[in-house]
Amino acid sequence: MTSKNKLIYLPLGGAGEIGMNMYLYGYGPKGKERFILADVGVTFPAMDGTPGVDLIMADTKFIQDKADQLDGIFITHAHEDHIGAIGLLWPRLNAPIYCRKFTAVVAKAKMEDRNQSSDMIEILPPYPEMKKVGPFKVGILPVPHSIPEASGLVIETPEQRIIHTGDLKLDPNPVVGEPFNSKLFADLGNKGVDVLVCDSTNIFSNKPGRSEATLVKPIA
């Protein structure tokens, strides 16, 4: 029997571009889908093309019109291109915010800068703990990146498992944050992954990136 539920992946920003990360996941029968949002970022304009513009944000009209179907916002890390618009856009979205502790501190400051209450921010422990949000179960997956407590997301529906990596670097010895846990990713792969949404700058280079640990000695 074919399921009447469908999985939706809609990048509102950040796909095929640098910055303005905002990814919408939906699940459910047509017209009655429930949604979660991964990241609410900004991008910075090119000064020669958009003078006088300070920030650029994604167009949220699609999910604004379905705001009562949005069950949660998950922030992967505290860089501006992933969190920078949270204080500006939250009034249009009006959904709980989930993230790790360091990211929550930054999110709280951005909300309060815009006179928004930060009471809806919930700090989550890392995977294998999972948060039930609507029809989704979401786990916070620690990954190495150039900021504390960067994370990917393990997103499960009753029918699929999605890995949304967030920004990551395969660094076994980062200066900041946790090292890349290849066993954790292998275990997830062995459980079965239906969709991998991978976000990594310079991913098409066939040369390994340098560990950030290599920078310590030159600047010490």
Question: In which residue ranges do the predicted regions lie?
Answer:
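His/Asp/Glu-rich metal-coordinating catalytic cores
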Residues: 2-74, 79-220
